[in-house]
Swiss-Prot record:
Disordered, as annotated region: 1-20
Entries under InterPro entries matching the protein: HssA/B-like_chaperone, HssA/B-related
UniProt record similarity statement: Belongs to the hssA/B family.
Gene Ontology process terms (BP): sorocarp development
Stated name of the protein: HssA/B-like protein 49
Length: 94
C-alpha cells in the first residue's frame, strides 16, 4: 500500500515533525471542521502528525495537499484549501 511507503519516507528525522506538532495545536484550535483537516493543514511536507491525524487525508495528496497554506513547513499550499482555511475542499467538506 502507498500508506506504508509514505510512512517510510516521513520516518526520516525532518523539521516537519517539529512543525507538525505546532500545527496540531493550530489545527485543533481552528475547530473549523475535523482534526484530520487541521492535522493535514499544518503537517507541512509529509508531517508525521499530518499523516497520523489526517488518517485518510493522505488520499488527497498527502498532508500538505488537503488544506495546504497553513503548513508549518512554509509550504505555500497547493491543495483545494490553499488559503490556509477550510474552504469546502475534500478535507474540509466533511
Amino acid at each position: 500500500m502507498t500508506l506504508f511507503s509514505s510512512i517510510s519516507s516521513i520516518s526520516n528525522p525532518m523539521t516537519s515533525s517539529k512543525s507538525s506538532i505546532a500545527s496540531f495545536g493550530s489545527g485543533t484550535s481552528m475547530g473549523s471542521n475535523s482534526i484530520a483537516c487541521g492535522g493535514g493543514c499544518g503537517g507541512g511536507s509529509g508531517g508525521i502528525l499530518g499523516l497520523g491525524l489526517g488518517l485518510g487525508l493522505n488520499l488527497f495528496g498527502g498532508s500538505r495537499g488537503a488544506c495546504g497554506g497553513n503548513s508549518g513547513s512554509g509550504n505555500p499550499g497547493n491543495g483545494p484549501c490553499s488559503g490556509g482555511k477550510c474552504c469546502g475542499g475534500p478535507c474540509c467538506g466533511i
